[in-house]
């Protein structure tokens, strides 16, 4: 992570004196936009200092629930740029003065509703995918399950995945004879038999996600 001071030259040796946090909200629904896992598949927040000599941005990952936070920023004006699974680049100007809260607005390619039920070791996910524009095409829908709450389309962030074409329907995981489930049973039991599921949808080449759902298997 790169820090550039907005203060005078002597202040370049000071610690950052501000910070920022907020939520990336759906411009239509005003709900947080669910995002991929923080890491190689994640959404990066780029903070560009304004009216300074800084030549690099301060970069950090947004969280899966659509929030973002960096408590180590210098006080000054920034342009925020977020290249996520949004119809257009999410960007804004913000003045950081101390610990600052600033929400952003963006439009996802699709909005996804999902719910999950469990019967024994069978997980059933009911879902619906609605493109944010009627001209957009949903090419694939994904159902995932994982041992940990970090879930997205990255192979390291899922224990199981199904791909379907329907924009509304049901995806079922029968884990009774699933190799990933049985070989990691100790891990699952140590977490109170909790698993995590999620739906993703590829629309116009970009993947949006549902919220992450926690379930308990028997």
Walk through the language-model features, giving the residues of each.
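Bacterial Sec-dependent N-terminal signal peptides
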Residues: 1-29
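Short Pro-Gly-centered beta-turn/loop motif in secreted/extracellular proteins
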Residues: 60-64, 69-77
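Conserved structural position at the C-terminal beta-strand
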Residues: 82-84, 201
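Beta-strand-rich modules
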Residues: 175-209, 218
């Amino acid at each position: 992570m790169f820090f550039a001071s907005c203060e005078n030259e002597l202040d370049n040796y000071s610690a950052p004196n501000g910070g920022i946090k907020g939520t990336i909200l759906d411009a239509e629904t005003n709900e947080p936009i669910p995002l991929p896992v923080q890491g190689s598949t994640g959404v990066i927040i780029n903070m560009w200092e304004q009216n300074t000599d800084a030549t690099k941005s301060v970069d950090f990952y947004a969280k899966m629930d659509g929030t973002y936070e960096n408590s180590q920023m210098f006080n000054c004006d920034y342009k925020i740029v977020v290249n996520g699974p949004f119809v257009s680049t999410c960007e804004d100007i913000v003045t950081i003065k101390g610990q600052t809260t600033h929400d952003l607005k963006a439009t996802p390619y699709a909005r996804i509703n999902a719910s999950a039920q469990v019967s024994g070791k069978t997980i059933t996910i009911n879902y619906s995918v609605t493109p944010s524009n009627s001209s957009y095409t949903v090419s694939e829908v994904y159902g995932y399950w994982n041992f940990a709450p970090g879930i997205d389309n990255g192979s390291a962030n899922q224990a199981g995945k199904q791909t379907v074409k329907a924009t509304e329907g049901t995806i079922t995981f029968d884990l009774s004879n699933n190799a990933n489930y049985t070989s990691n049973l100790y891990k699952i039991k140590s977490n109170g038999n909790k698993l995590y599921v999620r739906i993703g949808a590829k629309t116009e080449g970009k993947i949006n996600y549902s919220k992450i759902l926690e379930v308990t298997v028997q």
